[in-house]
Amino acid sequence: MELIIMSGRSGSGKSVALRALEDLGYYCVDNIPLALIPQLTDYLEKLKRSVVVSLDVRNLPEDPDVLEQVLHAFPSHISKTLIFLDCQRKALVRRYSDSRRLHPLSTHDLSLENVIDLENHLLEPLFQHADYIIDTTYFSSHELAEKLRELLNGSSEKELNIIVESFGFKYGIPADADYVFDVRFLPNPHWNLELRPMTGLEKPVIDFLENQSEVHQFISHTCNYLEVWLPLLEQNNRSYLTIAIGCTGGKHRSVFVAEKLARYIESKGKKVRVRHCSLEKHYKTS
């Protein structure tokens, strides 16, 4: 099991970091008391989940020895990593000024600069135990997310989850579609009485469409389009991309083309899922 403890200066980007790690599949818990972390890891270990816990200055024990004991109490089979987000004071002051949020320690009768210095002192034991220290002073949110992905995965590229779906225009365009391709101009198996009851998943329909040059040409051009633009979409920090292929009823052509495009994307090493939005409607009415 992997346990990542995320801490750092207030305003250094811990919330951004948690969102980025959640996108990577980690179970994230914000501001958990230090004493509860062992109980949480025991529970999640049974579920085979890796976890990220965020610690801020309010959840730390006053005695540094207690922190030391907790950090060294985890069993050896738990892979523990402590990441500390650092940031220069002038950048923290600017961020708090821009956001107009209160610092967690602002109840003290101190200026913001003095509160930041106090927090630095209180966080020093965590800083000393950190496996990785990331200075976020000049990072944008995207750059921090990329840094974390590079640190944990060995690559700054975010994995893009791609969904290829077929649909029928008669039922409406799927609301979640990022790209919509219209294949109603392709030869239609519907006009073949033997093929009409079948779907684009069945061999006679597949054979029919495989023999149409227009179908191959469309798939080839669409694959070329995706090959050019998918890398740029991945660099844009997207988590999901939905490609919708539509024909009249969502039964033959769109189903066949969606399957072909999904296999092509999969052959490029991408994570892809296929769903056929309108087939269920046909099964219900048949």
Swiss-Prot record:
- Supply the alphabetized keyword list: ATP-binding, GTP-binding, Nucleotide-binding
GO molecular function ontology, one term from the record: GTP binding
Statement: the UniProt record of this protein carries the keyword Lipid metabolism: no
For the keyword Nucleotide-binding, the answer is: yes
Functional summary from the UniProt entry: Displays ATPase and GTPase activities.
Matches recorded under NCBIfam families: PRK05416.1
Q: What is this protein called?
A: Nucleotide-binding protein HAPS_0087
State the organism of origin.
Glaesserella parasuis serovar 5 (strain SH0165)
Recite the lineage of the species: Bacteria, Pseudomonadati, Pseudomonadota, Gammaproteobacteria, Pasteurellales
